[in-house]
Amino acid sequence: MEPDLGGSAAQPPESDPPAAAALVFGDRLDVARRYYDALATAGVERGLIGPREVPRLWDRHILNCAVVAELMPESATVVDVGSGAGLPGIPLAIARPDLRITLVEPLLRRTAFLSEFIDAAGLDITVVRGRAEHSGVIKEAGGADVVTSRAVAPLAKLAQWSLPLLRDHGRMLALKGASVAEELDRDAETLERLGAGKFEVLECGVGIVATPTVVFSAELLPRGERPSRHREKKPRRQAGAPGGRGGVAGKVRRRGKSER
């Protein structure tokens, strides 16, 4: 029997999944629909999702996260920090059952919701209660291929939480908004000091969802591949000059269907 996530008889509001959901989730669309139902009922009742977000759960939350699956290597180990109601980790697990996903979340009411839904839906996801920067969490969940996060902190802070959980050459993927270029300009030196490099700003879900998901990507460089801090500083590039720190130069790379 499926557990009662909300502890009440509340029924989810009617909302048929958009056509894009069938493209993203395929034969696992029913599982995605169950996740929508859980967010719209228990998620609201427990304060994990604001009531005003319910009408846009599919587009702004579930699909917004799921399309990031196109960046994931096959059978990758993925750690989702500050997972909250399971975004983006649960949509990724539904869209890509080959991924080995761990959700890291410090609050008990959230981890309880996550564990109950995961058990009810039969998903192969690990839930770790704790803060991403704590040594116990790093010991349990570290060495990941990918660490994801969504709208939880500025890039510099996300890097402090995410990079210690990665293997060398693993990728930090932060789901961000339109201000990511400004954040990168402000925080790039801090990211480099922490060992990050190969910065990119990507768009996922192009041609699938109405508003593509903006993702900041950085790679954890092994110590021997990191730029020396003692090298002579290069002159700052003038505004509008090509290139730039990490090769981003304020440009966004759009990923179409042919790239997946």
Curated annotation (Swiss-Prot):
Amino-acid positions noted as binding S-adenosyl-L-methionine in the UniProt annotation, renumbered to this chain: 82, 87, 132-133, 150
Identify a single GO molecular function assigned to this protein.
Answer: rRNA (guanine-N7-)-methyltransferase activity
The highest taxon in the source lineage is Bacteria
Q: Where are the transmembrane segments?
A: none
What is the source species? Nocardia farcinica (strain IFM 10152)
Main enzyme class? transferase
Q: Where is the composition biased (Basic residues)?
A: 228-237, 251-260
Pfam families noted in UniProt: GidB
- Main subcellular localisation: cytoplasm
Protein name, entry field: Ribosomal RNA small subunit methyltransferase G
Q: What is its EC number?
A: 2.1.1.-
What GO CC terms are in its UniProt record?
A: cytosol
In the record, the note on similarity to other proteins reads:
Belongs to the methyltransferase superfamily. RNA methyltransferase RsmG family.
The annotated region (Disordered) lies at 221-260
The role this protein plays is: Specifically methylates the N7 position of guanine in position 518 of 16S rRNA.
Compartments where found? Cytoplasm
Protein keywords: Cytoplasm, Methyltransferase, rRNA processing, S-adenosyl-L-methionine, Transferase
